[in-house]
């Protein structure tokens, strides 16, 4: 087997043992002529989970899953049933909540570390805001929920402002 399809089996084994997650880049800042930011990306966090891995971590114990969901719901100001649905998904990654304040992200990080959970992730993300409000909004344009430029300078300079995505690779148990 190793000689006939060795490279193929090696690739399959590697894909089964690693999980790749994309890291979204921080969108570039648009400045006025005096160097003041007109469109800025603030650092926020996005919370995600590998449902299959989480169920393995708690050995399928529904009570533990519900406790984790309740604890996260309290931190994230969410409905615990919505979180449970994400825990029960048949996938390797689900978003729990996107673009939460860094303070909330820190609380989730602390909870996850204390509970010894490696399948719940807190990734750095960014959120676009305009410090001058509607000033020059017809020229600046705006971004969508995925931080993609949809109008104005945000759209015209999309390729420059969007940055280059990165990735995190984790080793997972099979």
Please tell me what each predicted stretch does.
Residues 1-174:
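Periplasmic/cell-envelope proteins involved in peptidoglycan metabolism and beta-lactam response
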